[in-house]
Structure formats: C-alpha cells, structure tokens
C-alpha cells in the first residue's frame, strides 16, 4: 500500500509557533493590557498654557485615557508625531496578521509576498485595518490652535493623519483686542477652505448637533476639525446661569452658523456642506415666536466684553433704525442711518 509522506517541515512549524505567540501577545495588549481594560480607545494632546499645567500631573487629572499637555506652542507637531506612532504600531499589527494568513494559506509567490510585507506603510492599509488605530484628539483654545499654532493646524488638515482637532472657540471676533486679520474669527471657514478634512462648526447650546459632529469626526478616516463655541461667563461678562442661553443665542443670531463638511459626500465642494441644525435657515435673520429678531449685535450686546463698542443713542443721532432693519438695507440705504439696540428698563 502507498504510505503518505510523514516528513515534518520543522522550519515551517517553528514559524507557525512563533507567529502564534506573537499574535497571542498582540491580542493580549489589545484586549486585556496591564490593567485588564485593553488598549485605550483614544488619546488626547492638550495645547495648553500655564493655566493647563495641572492637567499634566498624573493621576491628579480627570482623564481616563493617555494625555499629554504641550506648553511650548507646538501641539500640532506633537499630535502629528503621536499619531504617527499609533499608526506605526497599527501597521506592525496588521503586518503580523497578514503574515500569519500567508503562512496558513501558503499561496504562490509566498517568499516575495512575505518580503513585500516588510515595506508595508500605513497608507496602504484597508479601511477596516485603519480602524484598529485609536484616534488622537488635539484639544485647545482658538488662541492656542488658530492664532499661535495656525501654520501647524493648516498642515495637519492637509495631511492624511487621523488627528481630530477640537477647538474651543471664544468667538472673540477680533473685537476685544485690536488685532488685524485674526484667524480665530474665521477658523471654521479657514478649515473648510482646505477641502481635505472633515469640518464642523457647532455649539454646546445644541447638544445633538455637537454630539453628531464629534461622532462623524471620529468616524472620518483622515484629519477632522470641530470648532465648538465654549463660552465663559467670567471671561465674557455675564451671569453663569446664562451660559447655555448665550450658546443658543450665538446660533440664533447667526454669529456662529452651524455647518458640517464631509469630503466623502457626493457632489462638488459646495454641495458637501450641510447647514442642518440652523433655525430658519432660509431666512437672513431668525425671528422668534414673540416676533423678536435676533442679530449678531444682540448677541454681542449681552456680553460685558463688548461693552466698549456700545454707547447710549443720543438725540442727535441721524435717522436711527432698529439694528435688524439696518441689516436688511443695502449699502446705499444704510448711509446716514444709525443702528440701535432696544433694551427694556430694569
């Protein structure tokens, strides 16, 4: 009778044993880790100033994920380096899994396919493989990210790195400080102009739009920027119980229009911008149920930081008109007229 070949390929068997051990170790790091919780779901890089120094002192901070605080003003470069490290680790894991599959399937050209894996780069990974890489969130104020770190931010938005930038906007608008061409005043539009990143402009006054924007930014496979209006009563000059009201008013007054831009959406650039969430989006200004019209001036008037830009309407003021009517006039119609904001006594 014929007898089957009982020869054992010891080198092949050793490769399988080694690969099995490496896969088990990788799974242990990913699923369990040192503390039984597995790998962190995301990381945070904070672009801070002296007021954020406390957050760098582990464990005396509220974060339950790896956090690094940059005090040098180079948070964009730091975030890029960190996420590239994440991507390298993910690529190494994918390389290991692909190699294990090759050794099991043993296709034609196994040797050169094995060698080709050594040059695998993260940009060659499949979308489902890239999902293994935890996102990195770059968090900072508009002053740190859009003013001092503007060049780094623009570079990030034009890279393919999966860095998610969360900009806490004060909506300073270049009015508090005598600045020229302040990038903070239009950081959302500036990011939009790059066309390559997911961009959202939102407010804590609209929790649904805010939450959806963050979720979509995290799901996007490239860079993303979410600008969120994060008011501060002590900084901006109003009572703390008006915080949410001010956030809602910023949207209603068109000071901060809500929008989202997804480069993956169908159509051309303009058709990929969604204005969903804005009240009365077909109208220039919002009119509430009490027939009160909101304007950016009404939003600014409610904040002490803009007080120097207002003064009582004098009797000698020429042709005074309510500010919402002034907005509806063309350039010729506005000539010689004084816009005013009406307030109730007391």
Predicted regions: what is each one?
Residues 1, 39-42, 65-97, 232-346:
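Flexible, low-complexity linker and terminal segments
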